């Protein structure tokens, strides 16, 4: 029967937010039927595809038995279970080695600094003595971070200007494992998205530049306004990190460009917000190349199609505006591509994004910002 669902799916995606939704769409484009493991029937991807509960302890391993390959859209996973599943012969992409580095920032830094990659000076933060020791060496301001990644929407970091600020954060976040690192004099925040197959074949997308406020990514621009030397260093470093961690699929490496040079900030072992503009600005989006990589299919080209591309995130405000109610106005902005995730609005929640291409960055930025403002019923 034409509508009969397969007994074994070629691809399983754990999570049902917007990244899973876009992975699902990329797979369907290639004629691949993915299976989603949903947290909630009202989640973004769950609205567009069948899913399964993942609230029971055995649900993940049961789900994986229905799929040839399993991938993840978020970091809220049990690493021990992943290792057990791999030992049982199930194919997880990326694998436990990559996921451990993405999930645990201390482990990530120890593994990669041992191989010569540059991070800010850091230390575990188990109590006041660790704080005093670190402050004695590096002073303030400093940055306190949650050791375990909470996913793309988790704030997870706090800039502290003095010892009292640091002790307050430690008390407020007492239920988390914490680390502290030296504050960096940031000139720009950069991201390189890399797609890598199991055999080591990898392709990088152009370096993107991001703008953050209050822990939320507001805007992404590509190509980043940096020199050739920095661009080459960032892409080579990201490719090398993907290889060192034996990553399969898409991995994103975030950098700080500081007054002293390029410093690795974080890695994300999944498609990244900074790569959303590849839906319009690359022959093969990060989502399609993620599907290709984890299924060991040839990677597609990753070069930019336009001289400038800008993505502006659509983030819920205190006024409760629903961007879906203003879609008509946003679509009237010619040259802007609107992506809404089907989420109910709430303050700080990412509800969608808008991407615009242009011959120069300001032209693309103006189009994207106009469409985002229209969605949020706001005048520029």
Each predicted region: which residue ranges?
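Short, low-complexity Ser/Thr-rich regulatory SLiMs
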Residues: 194-198, 255-259, 342
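ATP-binding N-terminal substructure of ATP-dependent carboxylate-amine bond-forming enzymes
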Residues: 1-110, 114, 129
């Amino acid at each position: 029967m034409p509508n009969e669902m397969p007994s074994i799916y070629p691809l399983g995606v754990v999570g049902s937010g917007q990244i899973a939704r876009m992975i699902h769409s990329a797979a369907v484009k290639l004629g691949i039927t993915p299976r989603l493991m949903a947290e909630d029937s009202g989640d973004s991807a769950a609205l567009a595809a069948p899913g399964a509960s993942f609230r029971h302890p055995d649900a993940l391993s049961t789900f994986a038995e229905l799929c040839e390959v399993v991938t993840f859209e978020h970091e809220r996973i049990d690493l021990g279970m992943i290792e057990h599943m791999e030992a049982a012969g199930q194919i997880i992409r990326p694998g436990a080695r990559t996921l451990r580095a993405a999930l645990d920032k201390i482990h990530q830094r120890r593994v990669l600094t041992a191989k010569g990659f540059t991070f800010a000076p850091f230390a575990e933060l188990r109590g006041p003595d660790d704080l005093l020791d670190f402050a004695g060496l590096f002073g303030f301001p400093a940055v306190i971070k949650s050791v375990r990644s909470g996913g793309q929407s988790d704030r997870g970091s706090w800039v502290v200007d003095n010892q009292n600020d640091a002790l307050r954060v430690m008390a407020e976040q007492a239920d988390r494992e914490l680390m502290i690192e030296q504050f960096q004099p940031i000139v720009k925040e950069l991201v390189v998205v890399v797609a890598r197959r199991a055999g080591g074949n990898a392709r990088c997308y152009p370096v993107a530049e991001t703008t953050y406020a209050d822990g939320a990514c507001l805007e992404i621009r590509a190509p980043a306004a940096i020199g050739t030397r920095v661009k080459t260093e960032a892409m080579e470093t990201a490719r090398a990190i993907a290889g060192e961690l034996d990553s399969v699929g898409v991995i994103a490496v975030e950098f700080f460009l500081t007054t002293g040079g390029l410093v690795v900030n974080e890695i994300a072992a999944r498609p990244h917000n900074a790569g959303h503009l590849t839906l319009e600005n690359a022959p093969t989006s990060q989502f399609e190349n993620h599907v290709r990589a984890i299924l060991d299919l040839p990677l597609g080209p990753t070069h930019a199609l336009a001289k400038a591309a800008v993505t502006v995130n659509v983030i819920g405000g205190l006024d409760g505006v629903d961007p879906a109610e203003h879609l008509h106005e946003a679509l009237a902005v010619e040259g802007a591509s609107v992506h809404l995730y089907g989420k109910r609005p709430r303050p700080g929640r990412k509800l969608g994004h808008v991407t615009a291409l242009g011959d120069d960055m300001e032209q693309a930025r103006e189009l994207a910002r106009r469409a985002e403002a229209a969605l949020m019923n706001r005048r520029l």
